[in-house]
């Protein structure tokens, strides 16, 4: 039973240390974080291949148009 108390105390100390670390984290409002994320996305939109597709001539994954005919 003494080892159970020791383990419980060690676990509680670990939890307190974790909570102290989390309390010291600088936080920002969600609205500010969302605005910053949107600004970043808009600033880098031209570099995003999902928004501005890669030209077919430069796309290494384009479908090859080979036709196979068995005679």
From Swiss-Prot:
| Residue positions where Cysteine methyl ester is found in the record | 68
Which InterPro entries has this protein been placed in?
A: G-protein_gamma-like_dom, GGL_sf, Gprotein-gamma
* Annotated membrane topology: Lipid-anchor
**Organism phylogeny:** Eukaryota, Metazoa, Chordata, Craniata, Vertebrata
UniProt-recorded name of the protein: Guanine nucleotide-binding protein G(I)/G(S)/G(O) subunit gamma-2
The gene behind this protein is: GNG2
Molecular function GO terms recorded: G-protein beta-subunit binding
Give the similarity note: Belongs to the G protein gamma family.
The main location is membrane
Describe the subunit structure. Answer: G proteins are composed of 3 units, alpha, beta and gamma. In this context, interacts with GNB2. The heterodimer formed by GNB1 and GNG2 interacts with ARHGEF5. The heterodimer formed by GNB1 and GNG2 interacts with GRK2. Forms complexes with TAS2R14 and G-proteins; these complexes play a role in the perception of bitterness. Component of the TAS2R14-GNAI1 complex, consisting of TAS2R14, GNAI1, GNB1 and GNG2. Component of the TAS2R14-GNAT3 complex, consisting of TAS2R14, GNAT3, GNB1 and GNG2. Component of the TAS2R14-GNAS2 complex, consisting of TAS2R14, GNAS2, GNB1 and GNG2.
Top-level division of the source organism's lineage: Eukaryota
What is its biological role? Guanine nucleotide-binding proteins (G proteins) are involved as a modulator or transducer in various transmembrane signaling systems. The beta and gamma chains are required for the GTPase activity, for replacement of GDP by GTP, and for G protein-effector interaction.
Pfam families under this entry? G-gamma
Indicate where this protein resides in the cell.
Answer: Cell membrane
Q: What keyword terms does UniProt attach to this protein? A: Acetylation, Cell membrane, Host-virus interaction, Lipoprotein, Membrane, Methylation, Prenylation, Transducer
Q: What GO terms in the biological process aspect are recorded for it? A: adenylate cyclase-activating dopamine receptor signaling pathway; cellular response to catecholamine stimulus; cellular response to prostaglandin E stimulus; fibroblast proliferation; G protein-coupled receptor signaling pathway
